[in-house]
């Protein structure tokens, strides 16, 4: 079985080794056919505490790590401009 992958934006990094990633899902409304966007928030494991708020990341499904974590950060696609300013 293939592992699920999602692309999203980090919206919280306050927890140790955990980030909250918001993934936007767009789909047509079944009756009115208007494009509807729904945001789902996933808690993902960030082993190195490398992600910051605003980063674009790819998360993959994994074994349950805790009660609410079933995803892990596979890679950071782009860092947010704010995170780059703070680190320099």
From Swiss-Prot:
InterPro entries: NA-bd_OB-fold, Ribosomal_uS17, Ribosomal_uS17_bact/chlr, Ribosomal_uS17_CS. GO terms for cellular component: cytosolic small ribosomal subunit. PROSITE patterns: RIBOSOMAL_S17. Keywords: Ribonucleoprotein, Ribosomal protein, RNA-binding, rRNA-binding. Pfam families: Ribosomal_S17. GO terms for biological process: translation. Gene3D superfamilies: Nucleic acid-binding proteins. GO terms for molecular function: rRNA binding; structural constituent of ribosome. Part of the 30S ribosomal subunit. One of the primary rRNA binding proteins, it binds specifically to the 5'-end of 16S ribosomal RNA. PANTHER family: 40S RIBOSOMAL PROTEIN S11 FAMILY MEMBER, SMALL RIBOSOMAL SUBUNIT PROTEIN US17M. Belongs to the universal ribosomal protein uS17 family. This is Small ribosomal subunit protein uS17. It comes from Prochlorococcus marinus (strain MIT 9303). The lineage of its organism: Bacteria, Bacillati, Cyanobacteriota, Cyanophyceae, Synechococcales.
